[in-house]
From Swiss-Prot:
Catalytic activities: [protein]-peptidylproline (omega=180) = [protein]-peptidylproline (omega=0)
Record key words, sorted: Cell membrane, Isomerase, Lipoprotein, Membrane, Palmitate, Rotamase, Signal
Listed GO biological process terms: protein folding
GO cellular component, as recorded: plasma membrane
SUPFAM superfamilies, A to Z: FKBP-like (SSF54534), Triger factor/SurA peptide-binding domain-like (SSF109998)
Cellular localization per UniProt: Cell membrane
Full protein name: Foldase protein PrsA 2
GO molecular function: peptidyl-prolyl cis-trans isomerase activity
Length: 309
């Protein structure tokens, strides 16, 4: 959901600017910094920063967060957020906090990011479920679908470690499963996964590679990017089992529907339509002309978003 990740980035960037902007009207003379012969107030800081790109993104993210919390707060539980957080933490093991810090995140801000992502995902999926799915849509999804497969997957933080492991599995008589258990950085040392081409808990690059391999074949090094924390990981996979694909798409109709609906999360136009609907329902009005254009991407054709007087 790269489009949404771009929007949500502002939740943790320049949060201070947004906080200050919220209290600017009543505390605009509050002193933030003092020096000989001068001071810097909340108003000074707000006026200096509000036109920056980061401030624009931060305000947009704050608006979306407030709107979706109001409309969908009870649709995402703390348990779901913790589960998603733990899943990523387990993936990176002991280096997770370092990875977060390198991305400008803390555990708390990353959890906020996860929560907002899930709120928007819920809204997008609900809207997608109400869309009519044609036979053409089903057939296209079927053509791209690979049914259940089992693979041994090892993961690395460093490309050089992945290269060393690749050389090891290429050696004559090498035991891929044993090497994977020894070398993978997964916190629980899990290496065996069963999934289909619609899997979303594994990196998309890994799923695509596995879908394209024949049973018994091994990949080269696969580079995956986690857009939430802008971190690359490296993977080597071996497909050990693949189910035979049935000839009739109707045999997979329920699963194909899930995949089509989930695919809407990657459609920026559909996302924008859902967000625009939520913003319209919330009757969002921009009061400061500095932020007049932050909702432009969600406006209907020929509709402008002027600042309110």
């Amino acid at each position: 959901m790269k489009q949404m990740n771009k929007l949500i980035t502002g939740v943790v960037t320049l949060a201070t600017v947004v906080t200050l902007s919220a209290c600017q009207s009543s505390h605009n003379n509050t002193k933030l910094v003092s020096m000989k012969g001068d001071t810097i107030t909340v108003s000074d800081f707000y006026n200096e920063t509000k036109n920056t790109e980061l401030a624009q993104k931060a305000m947009l993210s704050l608006v979306i967060s407030r709107v979706f919390e109001t409309q969908y707060a009870n649709k995402v539980s703390d348990k779901e957020v913790e589960k998603a957080y733990k899943q990523t933490a387990d993936q990176y093991g002991t280096s997770f906090k370092t990875v977060l810090a390198q991305s400008g995140l803390t555990p708390e801000t990353y959890k906020k990011q996860i929560r907002l992502t899930k709120l928007v995902e819920y809204a997008v999926k609900e809207q997608a479920k109400n869309e009519t799915i044609s036979k053409k849509d089903y057939r296209q999804a079927y053509d791209a679908y690979t049914p259940t497969m089992t693979a041994e997957i090892m993961q690395f933080e460093k490309e050089e470690d992945a290269k060393a492991a690749l050389e090891a599995v290429k050696a004559e008589g090498a035991d891929f499963a044993a090497i994977a258990k020894e070398k993978t950085i997964a916190a629980d040392k899990k290496t065996t996964y069963t999934f289909d081409s619609g899997e979303t808990t594994l990196p998309a690059e890994v799923v695509r590679a596995a879908s394209g391999l024949k049973e018994g074949n091994r990949s080269e090094i696969i580079t995956a990017l986690d857009p939430a924390i802008s971190k690359r990981t490296y993977h080597i996979i071996k497909v050990t089992k693949k189910a035979t694909k049935k000839a009739d798409w109707k045999a997979y109709q329920k699963r194909l529907k899930d995949i089509i609906v989930t695919g809407k999360l990657k459609d920026p136009d559909f996302q924008n339509k859902v967000i625009a609907k939520a913003l319209d329902k919330a009757n969002v009005k921009i009061k400061d002309k500095a932020f007049a254009n932050i909702l432009a991407q969600f406006a209907k054709p020929n509709q402008k978003q002027p600042a309110q007087k």
